[in-house]
Regions:
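Acidic, glycine/proline-rich low-complexity segments that act as flexible tails and inter-domain linkers
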Residues: 1-35, 47-48, 55-64, 70, ...
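Short, structured motif recognition centered on aromatic/hydrophobic residues
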Residues: 37-45, 74-75
Length: 98
């Protein structure tokens, strides 16, 4: 059981909302592609310093056709808006995905 599954044991409603609202509804809306949603989500997580959530979303971004080079460019661009530490901390999460 991974860490997210362990947390959802204590908050089954949060799991239900994540699955049924966030991923089955919000992520499926047609005006933004899954690729664009991945970019937006990664930028938000990085800017807010939510690096614990990055591994899941980096894997999802790769499934949504983002390359490691594009992810590197995302975090490079973000450094100027969210700060160097946020960008470097986020960038360091790319490698463990291999």
């Amino acid at each position: 059981m991974n860490n997210t599954e362990q947390l959802f044991r204590y908050a089954p409603k949060l799991k239900q909302l994540s699955e049924q609202v966030l991923f089955a509804d919000v992520w499926q809306r047609p005006l933004l592609s899954p690729r664009e949603r991945s970019l937006i989500t990664l930028a938000a997580l990085a800017a807010l310093g939510r690096t614990e959530q990055l591994p899941f979303h980096l894997t999802l971004a790769e499934k949504n056709s983002l390359t490691k080079e594009e992810l590197g460019e995302l975090f490079t661009h973000l450094a100027f808006y969210a700060g160097w530490p946020a960008a470097v901390s986020s960038l360091s999460r790319i490698e463990p995905q291999e």
